[in-house]
Amino acid sequence: MFSINARTKVPIWVPFIARKGFSMSTRQLAEPKLNQVSSLNTRNIGIIAHIDAGKTTTTERMLFYSGKTTTMGDVDQGDTVTDYLPSERSRGITIQSAAITIPWNNNKINIIDTPGHADFTFEVIRSLRVLDGCVTILDAVAGVEAQTEKVWKQAQALKIPRIAFVNKMDRPGAGFSRTVKEVVQKLQTKVVLCNIPYFEMSKDDAVFVGVIDILHNKILKWNIDEDPNGRDITVIDLQEAKESHQEAYMEALKCRESMVETLGGIEETVVDAFLECDEDYMKIPSSILKSAIRKACISNQVTPVFCGSAFRKIAVQPLLDGVVDYLPSPLQTPVPEITASTSKVSKKQKQKKNSKVSSVPIEMNPKKGLIVNKNPQLTVALAFKVMTHATRGVMTFFRVYSGSLTSNTTVVNTRTGKKLHLNKVLLMHGDTPEPVSQISSGNIGVITGTENDVITGDTLVSHGPVKRNFTDLETSIKLLPIEIPPPLFNSSIEPLTAGDARYMNECINTLIREDPSLNVNVDEELGQTILSGMGELHLEIVRDRLINDMKAKIRLRNVAVSFKETVSKPSLEVVKASKNDGLVKVEVSLEAIDGPAEESTHADENGSVLLETDNNVVKLPPEAAASHINESLSERRWKSEHSLEELNDIILQGITTGLQLGGPILGLPLHSVVVRVIHWDFPVEGKEVSASMLLDASRQVVREALSKLPESSFCILEPIMSTRVYVDSGSMGEVVHDLSHRCSAHITSIEDESENMDSNAWANEEAENLYLPQDYTMKSGKNAVNFTNKKVVVAETPLRDMVGYLSKLRSITQGRGVFDMTYLGMRRAIRPVLLDS
C-alpha cells in the first residue's frame, strides 16, 4: 500500500502510482515491440454482453487509454474502430467480431469485440473458441439480460474465466448492487467487488463521479468537467481521509470484509494473512488479496466485479488493470482438446463424433507454452474467422496454440491435407492489418492469400522456418471444431438483370466464406437462389451489404422461416442412374432419421458421412465402389487424374445438391434423410471420363429416388424453439393467452423467478449474505427495471409464429417484457398452416 496526500490531483495515469498498485501510465509499448511481449504477459479476451450494454463503447475507451488511438470513436457518430462495416456504423450495432491488439502497463491485450444480437450468435461462438478470458459488460439499468445469460453459459461451458463490468452507472435507475445480486443468482457465480461506485450529491441527486477501490482503500474521482477525455483523476486515500469521507470508508471496510470472507473460503493464504494481521481486514496486504482473486478467477471459482461508465469515460482504466491482474495468460489456460484423425473432411461435411481418432501427446511448458507431439518446433493454429479486406483480399484470423507462425513459411491444412505457402502474417487493428515477422504461441493474427483453401474451424500446422517433412500424425491433427448452428430463415435473391447474375454470385460466395452460418441453395431448374440465415436481422444485414457495400444489383424477397421436407417412410427400392453409356453408375436407397444425425445409429456405420447442413447422412462404404476400382488402387493400375478420395467427395457433392433441390411437396430442401450408396462405378484405368459425369449421376440418382416415392411418403418440417418469456405477474395472463392462441405455443411451465433462484439455493444464499452498497441512483430512477414478482413463461413455439414477436410482447407489457429463444429442432408442420404462411 502506498501513501499519498489525502487528496492528490492526478492529471493522467501517472507512472508513480502505477508502481504502487495502479496502472495510470499512458506510456505504452511501441508498436514494433508489442509483438515481442511474452506469452506470460499476454491476454486474449473477448467483450461479451447483451445488445446495447456498451461493449463497443467500452472497447473504444480501452483503445484510447492504451494509446492505441488518439481519439475516441463514438457508436452514435459511426466512427468506431471495431465497428468498421458501413452496416455497423449506420445501425450502431456490432455485426462482426473485430480483433485488435493494445498495450497496457507492459502487457499485451488481444481484444475481440463481439456482437450482442442473437442473430449473430455464431460470431460469438467462434470467438469464444480462441479466448482465454472474457469481460462481461452489464447494463446497470437493465441488469442481467437474456443474451448476457446465454453468452455467459457458453463461456462457462468452455471454462473461460470472466470478469464483470457494471456499465452505465451514470444513468438514472442504475442499480449496481441489484445487478451484482443478479449476477450471483442468475449466472451462478461467487463475486468479489474490486471497486464500487462513488457518488457526490448535486442538489437532490446522487451523481456518479468515480469508484472506491476496495483493494487499495482509495477513492478515484474522475474530473470530467476539467478533462472530458477522462484522464484527470483525483485520488483520495481513505485511510487518511476517513474522518472527512466516513461513509465511503465504512463502505470500503464492509466490502473488504466481504471480499476476505469470500476469498478465505477458497484460498488458505487469505486466512493465514488475516490471522497474521490480528484479524484486521484493512491490514491484509493488497498483494495477497490480488493473488487470491487471480487464482480464484482463473479456476472459475470467483468473478471479479468492476463498475463505471464507458460513455462518460469513468473507470475504464481500472477495468484494464483487472484484465491484466485477474484474467489468465495463454500459459495458464486449460490444454485444448487435440485429436488426430486420418479422414479428410470437405467443407460440406461434419466430422463424426465417433470417427477413429488417436490422442496426440501435449504438454504445457511454463515458458514456451503448449508443446504438441513432443515437438517444440511444431506450430498448431486454429482458423476461427474469414473476412474480405478492401485491398488485401481474403484474410483468415487464427489463434496460435503452439509454436510460432512465421512469414514466408509453409503450412498444412489438416482438414484437406493441402500445403499452403504464407508470405506474410499480420496483426489487426480494427480493419487495418499490420505486418509482423511472426505470431507466437497464445496470440491472434491474420494470414492472406488463402481464398478457397481455409475455412472457419480448420487446423493449420507448420514447422516454421525449419525444413522438414510432416509426419502422418502431424498432418492429421485437429483442434476441437467450431459448431455452426442451423439457419432458421430464408429469403430468395435474384439479380435485377441476367447480366448481374455473375457478380451477384461472386458477392454471395464472399459473404458465405466470411459467415458459415449463412447458407445458399440454388435451384437450377427454377433459376432460383435461396439465402438462409440465423434471423430476420441477419438476412437484412446481408441485403444491405450486397446492395450498399458491394454494389450488387439484386432483389431480396421477404424473409421467411426456413421450412424443410423429409422422407417419412423409407424407400427400400434401389434406384440407379448412369452416364456415358453405363461407364459411370450410382445406385442409392433412401431412409429417414429421427433426431440428430450424430446421435443416430446411422452415424456409427462404416462410411457414414454427416453432411454439414440439414441433418442429412450419406452412407458411402468402401465396398460400394466397383471391385475394379479398389483393385486398380491396390495393384497400382490407377490412371485417373482423380484420387479415390476425390471421387468420393464428388459423389457427396452430387448427393448434397440433389437433396438441396427439394422434395415434391413445395420443393423445399430435404432434411433428416439418409442416402445409402449401394454401388458406384467410374473408369479409373482406361478411357478418360469427366468427373462431372459422376457429379451429374450422383445428383440425378437422388432426384429419381425422390420422384419414385409417392407424395404421401413426405412431410414438411418446421423449426421449433424453446422460448422463455420474462414478464411481470400483472402481464403474465395476457402473455400466456397470446402465446397459446396467436403463437401456437405449448406452454411447458410458468416459473416464479425467485423460485427459480431458490432451486440453486447456494447462489441465493450467497447473494443474500454478500455485502452490497446502497443503490443511490435507483431512488430517482424512473427507468429502472422492476425485478420483483417476475415470472418466466417457458414454452415450445413454432418459429413461424414468433416472427416479429418482440413488438407484440412490448405492447402487452408496456415495454418491460423480454424473451429469448433457443433452437430445439425440426418437427412436423401442419400443411394448411404452412400454405397460409
Curated annotation (Swiss-Prot):
Belongs to the TRAFAC class translation factor GTPase superfamily. Classic translation factor GTPase family. EF-G/EF-2 subfamily. GO terms for biological process: mitochondrial genome maintenance; mitochondrial translation; regulation of mitochondrial membrane potential; ribosome disassembly. This is Ribosome-releasing factor 2, mitochondrial. Mitochondrial GTPase that mediates the disassembly of ribosomes from messenger RNA at the termination of mitochondrial protein biosynthesis. Not involved in the GTP-dependent ribosomal translocation step during translation elongation. The lineage of its organism: Eukaryota, Fungi, Dikarya, Ascomycota, Saccharomycotina. It is found in: Mitochondrion. Residues 1-29 form a transit peptide. Residues 338-359 are annotated as: Disordered. The gene is MEF2. GO terms for cellular component: mitochondrion. GTP binds at residues 49-56, 113-117, 167-170. InterPro entries: EF-G-like_DII (IPR053905), EFG2 (IPR030851), EFG_II (IPR041095), EFG_III (IPR009022), EFG_III/V (IPR035647), EFG_V (IPR035649), EFG_V-like (IPR000640), G_TR_CS (IPR031157). One of its GO terms (molecular function) is GTPase activity. Keywords: GTP-binding, Mitochondrion, Nucleotide-binding, Protein biosynthesis, Transit peptide. Residues 345-355 have a biased composition (Basic residues). Residues 40-331 form the tr-type G domain. PANTHER family: RIBOSOME-RELEASING FACTOR 2, MITOCHONDRIAL, TRANSLATION ELONGATION FACTOR G-RELATED. Its main location: mitochondrion.
